[in-house]
């Protein structure tokens, strides 16, 4: 089976055989062999050969190809949404919004490029100071499984727009979505070698990251893999590395008037996408006392009624499955570990269908757990911590190595100002779900959540490097020579 796309041609992988599965039915959706180190090297060479011609195209010419890609996405929107839902387990209503985000990324990226990395000039004495940007060259993009279309797209589109050529290594859990996306690029008329698809698992990723022919690597995924890449690129200032990783994100609840609004926002923050968004709330900080008790009682009651089901279930569920049976089991193990160390179950996370990766929402009070593990539990398991005062809540929110997202639900603007000033996170929301983000804003965090290369609207920054120039059309002597210089 031809699973790799290199130099404008489909070819069979020669590496390890792997499959993707529907996480609920466990039916095989895609099967193929990954790329070997030799095939990775062939793809890098193809991207290098394609780079000069692609980079020399005008910006408008590259935009035309990107616009054609958007047209192709729209034409295949239903097929792509179904593919995303089937391979990730997320409901069709949600996978359809992912395709819409992929389409919208084109215009957003063009706007961002012009604003952040376009051309600017200003007079400076008898010359003109000009700022332009150049592409890095050949870049690798490592995509995640939770948004297998939208998140790789967030790197690939601005990288191509800037004039780079790309080697795309998707998650081995979502190869079918990647293949369909690349076919849309082909339909858009992208020249051979400009985008190459390298399917495979860990060995393929290691070979690509280690290949000396790449000029940069853009990664979205786990902190563990991101840290390994950061160590691998240590001592290589000649290569650009952009890491977008996860978080142990806190959502602080103040004593608000509308408890139902708070409950709805908490659910949208913690359980949407079955808790598989980088910005999902992992820790819910609730005030001690009767009001906090009432909030948690209402949250548990509503969360227990959330519909969980297969991606194509009708009526549509709120939550689909997590990505795999292995992931579901790991989350259930994490819940058992917390309970064994003093956590109290408020709402048990369950596996309603044996042999399927469906999980119901779980809520556990970990206030009494000593040395709580500072890890990202990537699923629908929310940890509650009770606090005695607002200063203590902020301290608890910041008690993490991560720094991706933090949020406050409060009727007090003064408290939000304090929270914003003292929070250490790249995304800080007030009375909005943590999983909401503006397309016109950067997306990224600090600490173990990234390496200060925010993506989304700021992706243009790491896709090109600035070139500053002083220019004048004629070479003339200055009116006054520098002291000590004699020309006669």
Swiss-Prot record:
Signal peptide: none annotated. Catalyzes the NAD-dependent reduction of succinylglutamate semialdehyde into succinylglutamate. It catalyses: N-succinyl-L-glutamate 5-semialdehyde + NAD(+) + H2O = N-succinyl-L-glutamate + NADH + 2 H(+). Pfam families: Aldedh. The active site is at residues 244, 278. GO terms for biological process: arginine catabolic process to glutamate; arginine catabolic process to succinate. It is an enzyme of class 1 (oxidoreductase). This is N-succinylglutamate 5-semialdehyde dehydrogenase. The keyword Lipid metabolism does not apply. It comes from the Bacteria. InterPro entries: Ald_DH/histidinol_DH (IPR016161), Ald_DH_C (IPR016163), Ald_DH_CS_CYS (IPR016160), Ald_DH_CS_GLU (IPR029510), Ald_DH_N (IPR016162), Aldehyde_DH_dom (IPR015590), SuccinylGlu_semiald_DH_AstD (IPR017649). One of its GO terms (molecular function) is succinylglutamate-semialdehyde dehydrogenase activity. Belongs to the aldehyde dehydrogenase family. AstD subfamily. Its EC number is 1.2.1.71. The keyword Lipid biosynthesis does not apply.
